[in-house]
Structure formats: C-alpha cells, structure tokens
Amino acid sequence: MPIDESLPFLPVNIAILTVSDTRTESDDRSGDTLVERLKSDGHQLADRAIVKDDPDTIVSRLQTWINDPDVDVVVATGGTGVTGRDVTPEAFERVCEKDIPGFGELFRWISYQKIGTSTIQSR
C-alpha cells in the first residue's frame, strides 16, 4: 500500500536500542544503520544505547525512554533469536500495554522476501 502523499509528514523522536553482549559503540553496525535510516527519512534521534542481553537491564532502559516525553518511539535491534541469551521479546512484553496483532507476521514476511527461510531464526 503506498504512502498517502496528501497527509503531512510528521517526524518522530526515535530512541535506538541495541541488545548485545558483544557490541560496542565502535562496532554496532545495526545500530548505525538504524540511525542513518531514521535520519535520512526525516526523523530525529532522541537517544541511543547498547545494553547487555539481560531482561532487567533492557526493561530499565525501556522504562527510562517510556517516561521521557522527548522519546516517541523505541526501535530495538538484537536479542531476538532463539538462543537462551536472546531475551529482547520477553523484556518488551514486560513493558508493553498493547500488542499489535499481525505486525510480527508482516515483518517476518517482508524479511522472508529478502533473506528467505533464515527469517525463522528471529522472533
């Protein structure tokens, strides 16, 4: 479905969260890509953080941003695989008030178009 060009563009303030036990500011390519894309699309970077694969740490960072009026959206990368250390979805469930039914399926379908069956390795 195309974007409705008659609607005004409304930029949002986005916080980028990288969840990883190994990434640092110098090698967080996924976080860098997200920042580049949000800026090129006209949005603002509200904040950025890298946290370990620990549910309490993730929740703490999310709560900080949820309570920050200068953050409209949080986009996360990492910690969504199927290993025991991948706990990002569970951490998000602890702070989310509403689920968006179908979003995960749509995201995986779009991913499947690009990376094939490897998309099943992400939740």
Model-derived regions: residue spans:
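Non-catalytic beta/alpha edge segments that cap or flank active sites
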Residues: 1-123
